[in-house]
Regions:
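Positively charged n-region of N-terminal signal peptides that target proteins for export
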Residues: 1-4
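N-terminal signal peptide c-region/cleavage motif recognized by signal peptidases
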Residues: 13-15
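Non-cytosolic coordination micro-motifs
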Residues: 18-51, 86-185
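Surface-exposed, low-hydrophobicity interaction/linker segments
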Residues: 47-63
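Mid-chain, structured segments of secreted extracytoplasmic proteins
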Residues: 60-102
């Protein structure tokens, strides 16, 4: 009877924990695929028609998490040419290490927080993506970031870099070759 209780508990709780497996999202899917899965999201286009970010709160994807962790954390899906290339969790305020510790536990990262350092960066390679954890202790807050970056879309990251380099920072318009030549002379 005791084994049935353990089995039943695992069966009931497994979907809740599985829902928080953000690393199971397939890279390369379109922004519309992600938007269709979300009840609420907002869209930001740093480079319209080329680079798009879909933002929501972490609680929407992982409702079973502790409220402070889930509500105070922004979940961003990054798309280049409408292909998912990065998933990012950002907790920009607070005085805890909830996201950093959640990332270590969820992704089975053994490296621990170095208390004496104001900033710590951990990077772990997986089969098709890299997991990056960042914590930065600032005077009034603790900034935390987890990024899952596709290693299958390096060509798109290169295109994004080239596109960003070709944009005039003052006008946010794309430079043409003639403007580049005039600036060099």
């Amino acid at each position: 009877m005791r084994y049935w209780l353990v089995f039943l508990t695992i069966l009931i709780t497994s979907p809740v924990f599985a829902a928080c497996k953000i690393d199971q999202q397939q890279f390369g899917v379109s922004s519309q695929t992600i938007k269709n899965k979300l009840e609420f999201s907002t869209t930001f286009e740093p480079i319209p028609g080329f680079h798009e970010e879909v933002l929501t709160i972490f609680e929407q994807v992982c409702p079973s998490l502790e409220k402070t962790l889930a509500r105070d954390t922004t979940l961003k899906y990054h798309f280049i040419q409408d292909q998912l290339v990065m998933i990012e969790l950002v907790k920009a305020d607070g005085n805890d290490l909830l996201i950093f510790e959640w990332g270590r536990e969820n992704f089975d990262i053994q490296e621990k927080r170095k208390i004496n350092e104001e900033q710590q960066f951990i990077q772990v390679e997986q089969s098709d993506h890299i997991i990056q954890l960042l914590v930065r202790v600032l005077p009034d807050t603790v900034f935390q970031n987890i990024a899952l970056v596709s290693t299958q879309h390096n060509d798109l990251f290169e295109l994004l870099y080239e596109k960003e380099e070709s944009i005039d920072e003052d006008t946010l318009e794309e430079l043409d070759d003639e403007d580049d030549i005039e600036e060099e002379n």
